[in-house]
Amino acid sequence: MATRRQFIKAGLVGGTYLFIPAGSASARAWPGVLDRVLDPTRIDKYVTELAVPPVMPWTERDEAGRVDHYTIGVRQLRQQILPAGMPTTTVWGYGSTRHPGSFSYPSCTVEATFGRAVRVTWVNQLIDRHGNHLPHLLPVDPTLHWANPQGGVSRRDTRPAFSSTPGPYTGPVPIVTHLHGGHNTQESDGYPEAWYLPRASDIPDGYARVGSFYERFKAIFENQFDSVWEPGAAVFQYANQERAATSWFHDHALGVTRLNVYAGLAGFYLLRGGPSDLPDGVLPGPAPKLGDPPGKHCYEIPVVIQDRSFSTDGSLFYPTSRASFDHFTGPYIPGSDISPIWNPEFFSNTMVTNGRTWPALSVEPRRYRLRFLNGCNARFLILKIVTDPMAPRPADPVLPFWQIGSEGGFLPAPVQRDQLLTAPAERADVVVDFTSIPVGTDLYLINEGPDEPFRGEERAQTSGQRHPEPLDRS
């Protein structure tokens, strides 16, 4: 029987360091904001347990039609992403509208079965308790080619014209959800132009409430299925006829995808069964299941790795000016066509795994199945398992990954890899065998991917670290 699992209660690795944010988000690239950006070296590492995303509750199961129904909303919530004792963070999360406790960042996992359809009513619930719309958590640049609700029906989904440099957009937030990796029909694909606003009571007159493809796809869906799209929502159906694989869902609204995902709108969608899947018992398990008791130990774990930055009050930090990228402070509009807020890329300074900064996973001397997702907006990851997170790069791995699958499902045969290279949105389905590691060994999942393509390098103390895996007795 396994002993009580403990976490590493280490503070800063390697002592005290000066604050040097990762990659292009360097100290000199954030003029005027360093006093409110949280120094990542002040965040204790490995004091928090790795969260395992639970399974999303369904609303109804139609056994005759072989359809699982879900009603999934998008809401604003506060969550402990930084370690206990530090401020909570306001984020957005998906969750079952019938289960208020299911809203989280990242989302609960949708478990799907080959040949059994999943129908989701996606509801935009970004409203306050009075029914008024919530503004975005992050700065929205209205000068891009984007959803542009304030442009009305005639100017939605365009790049609006301004006679002077505008401030950020603060109106109701458009959303639309895309199943990334799914074989989706057009009306259920989450087109960027099929967005919709929340059903708020204070949407200004003249605003477009839906994107230019919304009504078209609504008509197609309602004609094909007995399901109505209500205001502030869309209904999508996924046939689940493709190979068993690791997919994920995320927001996809035109011109704000980067912001909506950064705010928290992402979750796993795991398709099982069918001729391409493996028989039960071949791979490590169990995986999380609906109704699991708190603290249940699983041996198949979805793992999403994302980079984030925080303000000193715990809120998410995102650049408010183009100057954060290349020091360009204008002229913007009308002196040029350069957008004043948007950054071509942004590399944050803190690594977040399954919604927690630098967590620890306590493992037993056995095999684990880890389903990795690179959920970063711009960062490539090169993952290794090592015993010293501060070792000179390239570090020597102590354990290989046995990659068994990728975005499209299982590989023809397992591939032994000393490192995993993943681009944003890519998945890697791997087995890690801890049976040969002495009990009590501290292992670290590190990143050797650069903070910035071609010009930067990973920061060993911050963006170069993920989480450790201390070995327990069994």
Language model features with spans:
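N-terminal, post-signal-peptide metal-ligating segments of extracellular/periplasmic oxidoreductases
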Residues: 4, 9-178, 183-202, 215, ...
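Solvent-exposed loop/turn segments at secondary-structure junctions
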Residues: 78-79, 126-128, 183-185, 254-258, ...
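Alpha-helical secondary-structure segments
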Residues: 245-258, 300-302, 366-371, 445
